[in-house]
Amino acid sequence: MLTVLDTCYLLLRGWGDAVRHPLNHAMSQSSSISIKCPSCGREQEFTTWSSINVSLNPEKKNELRNGSLNRFTCESCSESSEVNYPVLYHDPDKKFMVWLNGEDADIRGLMAGDFLDEYHLRLVNSRNHLVEKTHVLEMGLDDRLLELFKVSMRMGDKSIPEGDLLFAGVGSGQNDLKELQFAVVSEKETKFIGAGFKAFEEFAVTFQPMLEAEPLEAAKWVQVDQAYAKALLQRHLPQNSD
């Protein structure tokens, strides 16, 4: 019997043979587990997806983004809760993979090889960050540059609310000008803000040399987030590390 928070090790344990060969891990993989409702205690089956290939199963992309892929709803009391478990998101067309809760070094070692040299391989630690990262890479944006830009936004605009600053897409802002759109997610609320796309392009010209000075190793899994960006800035701009 599993509770909502007990699923990670079980799913990781079954990865061994499946991730050794590219043809195997390219396929979407699901399994059924028994979960005990945290509210009423009733047990019921729940389908988890340890790997989703959005070319083979495009509907899973929307299920991830609207939360239904991770949502457990009790058939008895209708209580809903989020089930956190490892998910490998694979987009073979855009050539990227994003791994939620891929923390085990031995498992990550299995997910390597020359066939991944052209892939962007990213690690994230929450569903929100998984959704954000898929948005960024799907649009062909450099996620390292975007994380640096988010740090710059925080430093330059103290009016940005407290919370997790997440990229939400590209759209039109004031005067129909193209802008990057962000969600600021906190425990209390979610607010949306924009930043001019032209400002982002100018930022890219300035900071691209910094990224070129530290190219990412091919076929290596890396967690590109705010901590990554701040560490990069500290190495190259130590006088601004505060």
Language model: regions and residue ranges:
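Short, often N-terminal, low-complexity regions
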Residues: 21-22
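N-terminal cysteine/histidine-rich coordination modules
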Residues: 25-101
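Long, contiguous alpha-helical scaffold regions
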Residues: 94-228
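Charge-dense, extended regions
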Residues: 226-242
